[in-house]
Design a protein with these regions (language model features):
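Nucleotide-sugar donor-binding/catalytic module of glycosyltransferases
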Residues: 1-138
Length: 138
């Protein structure tokens, strides 16, 4: 059997304390554990950072990075730092207010293996409102 590729999941976070726990919970519930999570906090002023620190301390595949002096540098610089810190063959992005189905990493890895010449993969999304009801499904 072919070795599963390592995927680096980059989560850029800025003042998402309300959602980041659910996002990280969805990542640690993945059926395939062959991936790393790179969370870059962009100078949050809410309680995001302590929540992320707790996860990074509890789970060895979650790494936390911040900009020097915990500055706010914007999304582009935050994503760039995440890419620089990643170790994966492949990069996936998870927004800090999103959550993934439990088999999403497995789906990505299977798709990569089935399409070795692909430069990128795009998958469908489901938009869930604040009442946890689907609003859009692609």
């Amino acid at each position: 059997m072919k070795k599963q590729p390592l995927i680096s999941v980059i989560v850029a976070s800025y003042n998402y304390a309300k959602y980041i726990k659910e996002t990280l919970d969805s990542l640690i519930r993945q059926t395939n554990k062959s991936f790393e999570v790179i969370v870059v906090d962009d100078g949050s002023r809410d309680q995001s950072l302590p929540i992320i620190e707790e996860y990074a301390n509890r789970f060895k595949n979650i790494k936390l990075y911040t900009h020097p002096g915990n500055q706010n540098r914007g999304l582009a610089e935050t994503v760039k730092l995440g890419i620089e810190k990643s170790n994966g063959e492949y990069i996936a992005f998870c927004e800090s207010d999103d959550y993934w189905t439990n088999n999403h990493v497995e789906y990505l890895q299977d798709t990569i293996q089935q399409n070795p010449l692909a430069n990128f993969i795009v998958n469908g999304i489901k938009v869930i409102n604040l009442s946890n009801n689907p609003e859009y499904d692609s």
